[in-house]
Swiss-Prot record:
One of its GO terms (molecular function) is glutathione-regulated potassium exporter activity. The keyword Membrane applies. Belongs to the monovalent cation:proton antiporter 2 (CPA2) transporter (TC 2.A.37) family. KefB subfamily. It is a multi-pass membrane protein. It holds the Pfam family TrkA_N. It is found in: Cell inner membrane. Pore-forming subunit of a potassium efflux system that confers protection against electrophiles. Catalyzes K(+)/H(+) antiport. Interacts with the regulatory subunit KefG. The keyword Cell inner membrane applies. GO terms for biological process: proton transmembrane transport. This is Glutathione-regulated potassium-efflux system protein KefB. HAMAP family: K_H_efflux_KefB (MF_01412). GO terms for cellular component: plasma membrane. It comes from Escherichia coli O157:H7.
Length: 592
C-alpha cells in the first residue's frame, strides 16, 4: 500500500467510524456492530473504496494487542493464580467440547476429517476483542460471569500454539514443518521473556520516568507493547498473549495508571479499526452463492457454543441469572480463525470454497453477538423487572419512588443506605446482575438494565420521581444520562457524582449544580484533621476548610468557559495566592 493510498485508507476509516458508530448507538445496536457495518460499506464487497483487506486486518490486530496489555495491567500475578481453575478447567473444557462437536458437524457436510478438526478448533475460539468490549459495555468486568469469560478467553489465547502446531501434523507434513528443536527454542525464548520482564521492566521504567518527559514515557510504553507483540509473533505465538504477560508483570508497579493513560487512546482507535477490517473481510459473493449453508452454519455455531458455555457455567456454579450473559458474549467465532484457516489453507487442508465459507460464518457470527446480547438484556429485564414474588417484596412503600439511584457501586451504596434508613422511597437502576440479586435480597426495589434507555427510566418511575442521583463509573454515561433526563424528564432534580474536576466542569456546563466530587470532600476532611494534628485549633481548622471549599467552588464556576485552556493555570496560581492570603489573615486574627 503506497503512502497516498495509506493516507486515503486512514481518512476512510475515520470517516466510517465517525458516521457509523453514532448512528448505530442512536439505533441502539451498539458501537461494535456499527464498526462492522461500516467495514462492509467501504470494503471490496460494498462500495469498494478499500480492497487490500488482509494487510489492514493484520495491522488492526494491534487493537486487540493494546487491549490485552491494559487487561494485564489490571491483573496482578496473585489474581491470575486465583483464576487457574477457571482458566485450565472451564477454558480447556470449552475449547475441547466445542471443537469436538463442531468438527463432528463439519464432517457431516463433506469436510475431510483433517479439515473438520481444524475447522472445529477455529470455530471454537471466540473473539477476544468483541467479547471484552461487550463485557465492558454490559458492566460484566467485575461480575462472576465476566471473570469466567475472561478466563476462557485467556485459555483460548494459550491454545493458539498447539492449534497451529497441529496443522502440519494433520496435513501429513510433520517431518518438514514440525521441528521439535525449534519448539524447544521457542519455549526457552518465552521463559527468557518472562524472567527478563520480571527483573528489568520496573528499573527501566523508573529510569525513564526520572527524565520527567511525558512523551518519552509514552514512547517507551508503545515500544514495550509493540516489542512484546513482535517478539511473540516471531516465536509463532499470540501477539495478544505477549502483551498480556507484559501487562501482568507491570500490574504491581507504581507506573500502572500512567501506563494505562498512555495506551488508552491508541487502544480505542485500533480496536475500532479491527472491527471495521472484520466487516470488510465479509465475502458477500460466497454469502450469496451459499446463503442457506452459511445461515444454517451461523445458527448452529452460535447454538452449539451457547449450549456448551451455558452447561459449563452451570457446572462451575455461576448464578442462573448470569449464565446467559456468559454464554452469549462468547458465542461468536474469533479473529484467531482467520490465522488458523489461512495456515490450514497453505497446507492444502481445505478444498474449494471451504475456507471462504468458514470465514464468512465466523464474520457473521461476530455480527450476531451484539444483537444476541440485546435479546439477553431484554430477557433479563423481563426476569428482573417484572412482578416480584411475595417473599421478595421490599419493605419500602410500593408507591412510586421519590428518588431514582443510578448505579449501586460503593458510592451509590452509601447514598442508597442513607435514603433507605430515612424511609425514602427509592428505586435503583443497575446493570450488574450480581448486584441486582444482592440488592433484592436486602429489600431494595431494583431494575436491571442500561439506565440510558428511556423506556427503562419510565418503567422505574422517572415520570413520578422527584430526584435522580447519578453515580455511574464512566463520565460519558453520566453526561448522556443527564442529557436524557433534561430532555425527557425535565421535572427531575439531577444530582450527580463527579469523578474529578473535568467532569465537574462538564456537569456545570450542562446545568447540573448539585454534584459531589468523590475524593474532594473526604480529602478536605482529612486535610482538616491534619491541620489539627499540626497544632492548629479545631475551630480555626474548620474555618480554613470552609474557606478552601468556597474558594474552590468559586474557581470551578469561574473556569467553566476555559477549563481546557492554559488560562486556567494562571487563574489557579492566583487562587492559591488568594487562599494563602486568607490563611495569613486568619493567623493574624488568632494572634490578636
Amino acid at each position: 500500500m503506497e503512502g497516498s493510498d495509506f493516507l486515503l485508507a486512514g481518512v476512510l476509516f475515520l470517516f466510517a467510524a465517525v458516521a457509523a458508530v453514532p448512528l448505530a448507538s442512536r439505533l441502539g445496536i451498539g458501537a461494535v456492530l456499527g464498526y462492522l457495518l461500516a467495514g462492509i460499506a467501504i470494503g471490496p464487497w460494498g462500495l469498494g473504496f478499500i480492497s487490500d483487506v488482509d494487510e489492514i486486518l493484520h495491522f488492526s490486530e494491534l487493537g486487540v494487542v493494546f487491549l490485552m496489555f491494559i487487561i494485564g495491567l489490571e491483573l496482578n500475578p496473585s489474581k491470575l493464580w486465583q483464576l487457574r481453575r477457571s482458566i485450565f478447567g472451564v477454558g480447556a473444557a470449552q475449547v475441547l467440547l466445542s471443537a469436538a462437536l463442531l468438527a463432528g458437524l463439519l464432517m457431516l457436510t463433506d469436510f475431510a476429517w483433517q479439515a473438520a478438526v481444524v475447522g472445529g478448533i477455529g470455530l471454537a475460539m471466540s473473539s477476544t476483542a468483541m467479547a471484552l468490549q461487550l463485557m465492558r459495555e454490559k458492566g460484566m468486568n467485575r461480575s462472576e460471569s465476566g471473570q469466567l469469560g475472561f478466563s476462557v478467553l485467556l485459555f483460548q489465547d494459550l491454545a493458539v500454539i498447539p492449534a497451529l502446531a497441529l496443522v502440519p501434523l494433520l496435513a501429513g507434513s510433520a517431518d518438514e514443518h514440525f521441528d521439535w528443536m525449534k519448539i524447544g527454542m521457542k519455549v526457552l525464548a518465552f521463559v527468557g521473556m518472562l524472567i527478563g520482564g520480571r527483573y528489568l521492566l520496573r528499573p527501566v521504567f523508573r529510569f525513564i520516568a526520572a527524565s520527567g518527559v511525558r512523551e518519552v514515557f509514552t514512547a517507551a510504553t508503545l515500544l514495550l507493547v509493540l516489542g512484546s507483540a513482535l517478539f511473540m509473533d516471531a516465536l509463532g505465538l499470540s501477539m495478544a498473549l505477549g502483551t498480556f504477560i507484559a501487562g501482568v508483570l507491570l500490574a504491581e508497579s507504581e507506573y500502572r495508571h500512567e501506563l494505562e493513560t498512555a495506551i488508552d487512546p491508541f487502544k480505542g482507535l485500533l480496536l475500532g479499526l479491527f472491527f471495521i477490517s472484520v466487516g470488510m473481510s465479509l465475502n458477500l459473493g460466497v454469502l450469496y452463492t451459499h446463503l442457506l449453508w452459511v445461515v444454517i452454519s451461523v445458527v448452529v455455531l452460535v447454538a452449539v457454543k451457547i449450549l456448551v458455555l451455558y452447561l459449563l457455567a452451570r457446572l462451575y456454579g455461576v448464578r442462573s441469572s448470569e449464565r446467559m450473559q456468559f454464554a452469549g458474549v462468547l458465542s461468536q467465532g474469533g479473529e484467531f480463525a482467520f490465522v488458523l484457516f489461512s495456515t490450514a489453507s497453505s497446507q492444502r487442508l481445505f478444498q474449494g470454497d471451504q475456507m471462504a465459507l468458514l470465514l464468512v460464518t465466523v464474520t457473521l457470527s461476530m455480527m450476531t453477538t451484539p444483537l444476541l446480547m440485546k435479546l439477553v438484556d431484554k430477557w433479563l429485564s423481563r426476569q428482573f423487572n417484572g412482578p416480584e414474588e411475595e417473599d421478595e417484596k421490599p419493605w419500602v412503600n410500593d408507591d412510586k419512588p421519590q428518588v431514582i439511584v443510578v448505579g449501586f457501586g460503593r458510592f451509590g451504596q452509601v447514598i442508597g443506605r442513607l435514603l433507605m434508613a430515612n424511609k425514602m422511597r427509592i428505586t435503583v437502576l443497575e446493570r450488574d446482575i450480581s448486584a441486582v440479586n444482592l440488592m433484592r435480597k436486602y429489600g431494595y426495589k431494583v431494575y436491571y438494565g442500561d439506565a440510558t434507555q428511556v423506556d427503562l427510566l419510565r418503567s422505574a418511575g422517572a415520570e413520578a420521581a422527584e430526584s435522580i442521583v447519578i453515580t455511574c463509573n464512566e463520565p460519558e454515561d453520566t453526561m448522556k444520562l443527564v442529557e436524557i433526563c433534561q430532555q425527557h424528564f425535565p421535572h427531575l432534580h439531577i444530582l450527580a457524582r463527579a469523578r474529578g474536576r473535568v467532569e465537574a466542569h462538564e456537569l456545570l456546563q450542562a446545568g447540573v449544580t448539585q454534584f459531589s466530587r468523590e475524593t474532594f470532600s473526604s480529602a478536605l476532611e482529612l486535610g482538616r484533621k491534619t491541620l489539627v494534628t499540626l497544632g492548629m485549633h479545631p475551630h480555626q481548622a474548620q474555618r480554613a476548610q470552609l474557606h478552601f471549599r468556597r474558594l474552590d467552588m468559586r474557581m470551578l464556576r469561574e473556569l467553566i468557559p476555559m477549563h481546557a485552556d492554559t488560562v486556567q493555570i494562571s487563574r489557579a496560581r492566583e487562587a492559591r495566592r488568594e487562599l494563602e492570603e486568607i490563611f495569613q489573615r486568619e493567623m493574624q486574627q488568632e494572634r490578636r
